[in-house]
From Swiss-Prot:
The lineage of its organism: Bacteria, Bacillati, Actinomycetota, Actinomycetes, Propionibacteriales. It comes from Nocardioides sp. (strain ATCC BAA-499 / JS614). The keyword Repressor does not apply. One of its GO terms (biological process) is tRNA modification. Transmembrane segments: none annotated. The gene is rimO. This is Ribosomal protein uS12 methylthiotransferase RimO.
Length: 480
């Protein structure tokens, strides 16, 4: 009997750049993919021009996001084209993420510049898939389908499913690799959504609502803290539903103090609360648990009851204002942000006025304003009463102007208020030292920043300060 003593072939050391578009949930997915790739021997680089392979984690939420994703893929393809002329090193461009999952073969056919389109089911084997593309092998993109059909109907049984869920990987060590060294990190509570808002396609490609086990969330929280995270930003499509498929709808109230107690974590922040599901116990937990930011990301979407009913949502100005009163009864200085959709099919001028009156009364810190656009496969796309694009743009401009004024007013109301600022950027320049961070009422990237005056703080410090000025949503504060 003879044995083959020849050495195993040495795999080529490949570099990869992850380009992430869209929301914080996508950031988590990118870091999971990065962890899988690094574990398989890929070298991670930041600059796509310096990478052998470019993986673009796309967003497929609204039309503008889709365009941005396609443009980014084309830019990466330009790098590959230049390398083929001896002016670079890029050898493969791959699309992943929501746009890739949502359109699959259709995206691959319409965008031949991308070497492959990977769906969520490809994520566990991303390294092998990517190596095969670099080796010149073809990859057949998936046929798009409704991912809600992949999980059991009974919520409690969903945790037993073997269907890959991006951002839910767990085990003895976190399957994740941080792509920046900032003090804030997103942490997934759940994926998918069981609600059926008429304008939203997300459940079709993200699937039914699936909570992560608390032990997995806590394990990843500890890992993030060990890797420099000081604020944990809890993300999902609907955080108020966390635990319902685990048999405990109040699980988030239990989990929050445990997360806040993780060594090294200074602050925990919850995102995306569905107003119709925001219960009194959860409000109290967010408002009063030490280490949890009194921050309420309430997605109202509109205030007119008729419009909300057409959206397959619930509420009206009175119930929303009562909810805000409940929040501020527990935490008067709580941060509250929201998003609204303007120009929804059938929206009348009276509906628009109702929305504007509500925004004035609500005193929100920040409001995102979006113009309605049809999304493939949604109920709203079939509705009558569509407004023309010019009218939608005019309404968006009107509401945006109002929101800009209201945001400035709300920030000015915080003058003299004491805040705790997590420092995220320190820069020395000709004009002096800039120390930028966020107070408890300011979420990452979308809610403005707080600038510390005459401060020697470092990135990651939590500084107590008093607000002395404001501009838009931004604040100036002096350390105490």
């Amino acid at each position: 009997m003879t044995t083959d003593s020849s050495p195993a072939p040495v795999r080529e050391l490949l570099s990869v750049a992850m380009v992430t578009l869209g929301c914080a949930r996508n950031e988590v997915d990118s870091e999971e993919l990065a962890g899988r790739l690094e574990a398989d021997g890929f070298r991670l680089v930041q600059d796509p021009a310096e990478a052998d392979t470019v993986v673009v984690n796309t967003c497929g939420f609204v039309e503008a996001a889709k365009k941005d994703s396609v443009d980014t893929l084309l830019q990466a393809a330009d790098l590959k084209a230049r390398s083929e002329q001896g002016q670079g090193r890029t050898r493969a461009v791959v699309a992943v993420g929501c746009l890739a999952e949502r359109y699959g073969k259709d995206l691959a056919a319409s965008l031949p510049e991308a070497d492959a389109v990977f769906g969520f089911d490809d994520y566990p084997d991303i390294a092998a898939r990517l190596r095969s593309i670099v080796a010149g092998e073809a990859h057949e993109a998936h046929t798009p389908h409704d991912r809600r059909t992949l999980l059991p109907i009974t919520p409690v049984e969903r945790v037993l499913s073997t269907t890959p869920v991006p951002g839910h990987a767990s085990g003895p060590a976190s399957v994740r690799r941080r792509l920046d060294d900032g003090p804030t990190a997103a942490l997934k509570l759940a994926s998918g959504c069981d609600r059926r808002c008429s304008f939203c396609a997300i459940p079709a490609f993200r699937g039914s609502f699936l909570s992560r086990r608390p032990s997995d969330v806590l394990q990843e929280a500890r890992w993030l803290a060990d890797h420099g995270a000081r604020e944990l930003f809890l993300v999902s499509e609907n955080s108020t539903s966390y635990g319902k498929d685990l048999g405990d709808l109040r699980l988030l109230e239990t989990l929050l103090p445990e997360l806040a107690a993780v060594d090294g974590v200074e602050r925990v922040r919850v995102s995306y609360l569905q107003p119709a599901e925001t219960r009194a116990g959860l409000i109290e937990a967010i408002a009063s648990t030490p280490g949890v930011a009194p921050y309420f990301d309430l997605s109202f979407q509109h205030a007119s009851a008729p419009v909300l009913r057409r959206m397959r949502r619930f509420g009206d100005p009175e119930s929303f204002l009562a909810l805000l009163a409940q929040v501020r009864g527990h935490a008067p200085a709580a941060g509250v942000r929201s998003n609204v959709i303007v120009g929804f099919p059938g929206e009348t001028e009276q509906d628009l006025e109702t929305l504007c009156d509500f925004l004035v009364a609500a005193r929100l810190d920040v409001t995102g304003v979006f113009g309605y656009s049809d999304e493939d496969g949604t109920e709203a796309a079939t509705y009558d009463g569509k407004l023309d694009d010019d009218e939608i743009r005019a309404r968006v401009e009107h509401v945006s102007d109002l929101v800009e004024e209201l945001t400035s007013q709300r920030a000015a109301e915080r003058l003299g208020e004491q805040v705790e600022v997590l420092v995220e950027r320190v820069e020395d320049g000709p004009g002096g030292r800039t120390v930028e961070g966020r107070a408890a009422h300011q979420g990452p990237e979308v809610d403005g920043a707080t600038y510390l005056l005459d401060s020697d703080a470092r990135v990651g410090d939590l500084v107590r300060a008093v607000v002395v000025g404001s501009e838009g949503a931004d604040l100036d504060a002096r350390p105490l």
